[in-house]
């Protein structure tokens, strides 16, 4: 649940975030509570397939967050690593939600695979668009510049770093 509030943003899609209302510690506890409540419901209802999807999603998001932290320290991220990170973080979460929806209505395995793949593509597109918002207008409901301040390596930043000279890179990194 901490990954959902990791950027400490006060707004989400134009609304106040849980973090803004309750601060980090309470936001993390509320997230942990909701996650454990959902997992217990899966156990009570013998929805082990759904429990497996949730567990795998949390694992993927954690791996993605750790990779992002590691790479941000060194600023040695390329497009391939960027896509690995967003697939493990945002895309795996959206993909998992789509998969759970399909599993919960007893879809065929081919339908589950298709909707899971669609969710992965939606998650990738969502994250790229979210990264672009960091550089956009104020009217979008997300504060600008947070990713840069937190040294998040985003696709626009990767493209910029690949297309500027060394002195410009040094200036940008400072």
Task: Pin down the residues of each PLM region.
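Mg2+-dependent prenyl diphosphate-binding active-site environment of isoprenoid biosynthetic enzymes
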Residues: 1-2, 6-169
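A mobile "lid/hinge" subdomain adjacent to the ATP/sugar-phosphate binding pocket shared
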Residues: 170-174
